[in-house]
From Swiss-Prot:
UniProt-annotated location(s): Cytoplasm
PANTHER family the UniProt entry points to: RIBOSOMAL RNA LARGE SUBUNIT METHYLTRANSFERASE K/L, RIBOSOMAL RNA LARGE SUBUNIT METHYLTRANSFERASE K_L
Xref: PROSITE patterns: THUMP, UPF0020
Keywords: Cytoplasm, Methyltransferase, RNA-binding, rRNA processing, S-adenosyl-L-methionine, Transferase
SUPFAM superfamilies assigned: S-adenosyl-L-methionine-dependent methyltransferases
A UniProt-annotated Pfam family: RlmL_1st
Enzyme Commission number: 2.1.1.173, 2.1.1.264
Gene behind this protein: rlmL
The organism of origin for this protein: Magnetococcus marinus (strain ATCC BAA-1437 / JCM 17883 / MC-1)
Name of the protein this chain belongs to: Ribosomal RNA large subunit methyltransferase K/L
Entry keyword annotation includes Nucleotide-binding: no
GO CC terms, sorted: cytoplasm
Family: Belongs to the methyltransferase superfamily. RlmKL family.
Length: 722
């Protein structure tokens, strides 16, 4: 009985463990980036031939002491390497992990190699040579603390190298990751039932090839010409055992029935590459390949009358100018799954979970966080069996909303007000193509909540009820409201997010409330923004400031723009879109500065010299900077006592120092827009005028129809130097 360790990418361990169990492995133990198991020599070779998800199969030889380099050398020297490798043979070593005395994997590998060749030279009179490519024996050393484990790499090189991929495109999908995506989408079971498979953005063809190999019961190692066990001398009968396994795999392949598998890409060059790879995999005739746009896909006339499986890996859109294109691409994919392929299982690997919202699917998918090489990705599954735990990223329902007692009469009263508001705003929303707006804001005293629309999502903010209203009554009214929202607004219940807005103390209006990560991509005036619907009190996009952002965009051309207390940088994006010469965004929060940078990159704005992001206390920064600007947006918090600040900040108390200090940064003919959401705010007109400032209140000009309420949600002034 041997002990083995099969390595794989993080996140794929469940698929690998299930695979090994099906092969007959014993004591299967999932670990980080791999799975331990036990079995005879046959199970090790079978894993090399049949594992679609493993990267390497390591046969464990011995635990050793690696507390010092000398201990490592001495321990390895005790192993009878002459029984594993000829003196005239070649070897290579891999060292994974470090400790306090072996601080670099290259050093650990060197000590391992020295001990092996010294042992063989002492026993045989000559020593093996080192070969980096396809050695006779590849030795693996894993270090954890003072303990190491030495093993033989039976695979020899990564098992993802199936042998069929001649060429690839950008960010190619590793073959073992592709196989895991298919496992997670349930393709193996569906293929046995005769379900069809589609990949409408197949790139170099990895997913359809892996789908065909899985459906056709083709051993993923059958095309490989090299394995690490081929010239390993540590066991007898390997050649005969391997031949038997190979013959068995051919018999299994001959008995399998291949379902319909179709793939395509809009890029003619990628279709050509995919065709060459399909031929190299000996699968021509089994995969139908098309040059076709995602929007052009329809069900084939000969497809079985049953739902199939779609798995795809769309482009990641990391280059400038691709973001808008990608949003359209994901929208087309969503239309395909909502239309011709309605009811199909699907798995979509995306470079950013934000793209999920662009697909417009009625249900929130299960999410898995995976990596395609160095690129972090989200794998979104629809129509598959739910996992024991909710997928990361799915909004957790607020307790009681699904099962509470609802008063039909009260609920209808709230529904009528929603319909009235929708009717009032409909022309404006349609004419201006408004995607994010406020539909309701405590318009009825009984229902103290705000309802905001973010494209196909709805966010409900329940205001904290006065102490005179019992909690049970407030909760019952929330039940009433939420019971009618999906039907009136035409959204599924899963796309209604409920939060409670309490009186904020200091900077905690920006503190994290949850960690569900429900991020959505929304559009405003042709620009794209990331919003987080669940984790913070505010989403990252203030709907009430939409007119102010439009004004900034209209006035930014050839101007130097400053955004103080920049939050998620939405005003900065508008300024850049308006042609600002430079933009500077200042905030004390790393979280929001990084968010602001993502928003800029979403819209194709990069360049650290043209667009600067500064982490600083804004009050201190304006007092020390020598920069000047033509256009400034100042939207400070009402109050802040962040732990990163030495003193608290109060907009009513500190307005003269703040506004005066910011106005000092204005160039001649420059404009400062100051906005505040503080209720009962009183501008110190006389004190500011004494600083030679001219102030014009423009509050009504900065409110769209969805915020025409009294008192206004914010007040705003246009300030210039007199």
């Amino acid at each position: 009985m041997y002990r083995y360790f099969a390595t794989t990418a993080r996140g794929l361990e469940p698929a690998l463990a299930a695979e090994l169990k099906r092969m007959g492995a014993k004591s299967v133990r999932p670990a980080s980036a791999g799975v331990g198991f036990e079995g005879d020599l046959e199970i090790g070779l079978r894993a090399c031939l049949w594992s679609r998800v493993a990267t390497r199969i390591i046969l464990s030889l011995k635990k050793i002491d690696v507390s010092t380099p000398e201990a490592l050398y001495a321990s390895v020297l005790e192993i009878p390497w002459e029984d594993h490798l000829d003196a005239e043979g070649t070897l290579s070593v891999d060292c994974i992990g470090t400790n306090d005395t072996i601080r670099h994997t290259n050093f650990g590998g060197q000590k391992l190699k020295d001990a092996v060749v010294d042992r063989i030279r002492d026993k045989k009179g000559s020593r093996p040579s080192v070969a980096r490519e396809r050695p006779d024996l590849r030795i693996n050393l894993g270090i954890r603390g003072n303990e190491g484990r030495v093993g033989i790499d039976l695979s020899g090189e990564g098992l993802h190298r199936r042998g069929y991929r001649l060429r690839t495109g950008d960010a190619p999908l590793k073959e073992n990751l592709a196989a895991a995506l298919l496992y997670f989408a349930g393709w193996e079971e569906q293929a046995r039932l005769g379900a069809p498979f589609v990949d409408p953005m197949c790139g170099s063809g990895t997913l359809p090839i892996e789908a065909a190999m899985m459906a056709g019961d083709i051993a993923p190692g059958s095309l490989r010409r090299y394995f690490g066990f081929r010239r390993w001398r540590g066991a007898s009968g390997i050649a005969e055992l391997w031949q038997r396994l190979a013959d068995e795999s051919i018999e299994r392949q001959n008995q399998a029935k291949m379902p319909i598998i179709e793939a395509g890409d809009s890029d003619a060059n990628m279709v050509h590459i995919a065709q060459a790879n399909i031929e190299e995999a000996e699968l021509e005739g089994h995969i139908r390949l098309h040059q076709r746009d995602v929007a052009a896909w329809q069900k084939g006339a000969d497809w079985p009358d049953r739902p199939g499986v779609l798995v795809t890996n769309p482009p990641y859109g990391e280059r400038l100018g691709e973001v808008v294109e990608l949003k359209g691409l994901f929208a087309k994919l969503g239309m395909l799954l909502n239309g011709p392929l309605l009811g199909w299982r699907s798995g979509v690997l995306m470079g950013d979970v934000l793209w999920q919202s662009a697909m417009g699917l009625p249900q929130q998918g299960q999410r898995m966080d995976l990596n395609n090489g160095p690129i972090p990705c989200a794998y979104i599954l629809h129509g598959t069996e739910p996992k024991p735990q909710a997928a990361k990223g799915a909004p957790a329902p607020k307790p009681g909303l699904q099962q509470g007692v609802v008063s039909p009469e009260n609920a209808q009263m709230f529904a009528n007000r929603l319909k009235k508001n929708q009717k009032r705003l409909k022309k404006w929303v349609t004419r201006e193509n408004v995607r994010c707006y406020r539909l309701y804001d405590a318009d009825m005293p009984e229902y103290a909540l705000a309802v905001d629309r973010y494209e196909e999502w709805v966010v409900v903010q329940e205001y904290q009820a006065p102490s005179s209203i019992p909690d049970a009554d407030a909760h019952r009214r929330l039940q009433d409201a939420c019971s009618v929202l999906p039907e009136v607004l035409g959204v599924p219940p899963e796309r209604v997010v409920v939060k409670q807005r309490k009186r904020q103390k200091g900077y905690n209006q920006y503190d994290k409330m949850a960690n569900r990560g429900q991020k959505v991509l929304v559009a405003e005036q042709g620009l794209n923004f990331e919003v987080n619907l669940t984790d913070y009190l505010d989403t990252g996009l203030f709907p009430d400031h939409a007119p102010m952002r439009r004004r900034i965009q209209q006035e930014a051309a050839n101007r130097r723009f400053l955004n103080l207390f920049c939050y998620t940088g939405t005003a900065t994006v508008h300024a850049a879109a308006g042609g600002a010469l430079t933009t500077t965004s200042v905030d004390l929060s790393n979280t929001y500065l990084e968010w602001a940078q993502r928003n800029m990159e979403l819209n194709g704005f990069k360049g650290e010299h043209q667009h600067r992001f500064i982490k600083a206390n804004c009050m201190q920064w304006i007092a020390t900077t020598d920069q000047t600007f033509d256009l400034i947006f100042l939207d400070p918090p009402t109050f802040s006592n962040s732990k990163s600040m030495l003193e608290s900040f109060d907009i009513q108390r500190d307005q003269v120092t703040l506004i005066g200090g910011v106005a000092r940064l204005l160039n001649p003919d420059g404009v400062l827009y100051f906005s505040t959401n503080r209720k009962k705010f009183k501008l110190e007109q006389d004190l500011l005028s004494a600083q030679n400032l001219h102030m014009e209140e423009i509050t009504q000009q900065t409110l769209d129809p969805d915020f025409h309420r009294e008192p206004p949600i914010h007040r705003c002034w246009r300030i210039t130097c007199a």
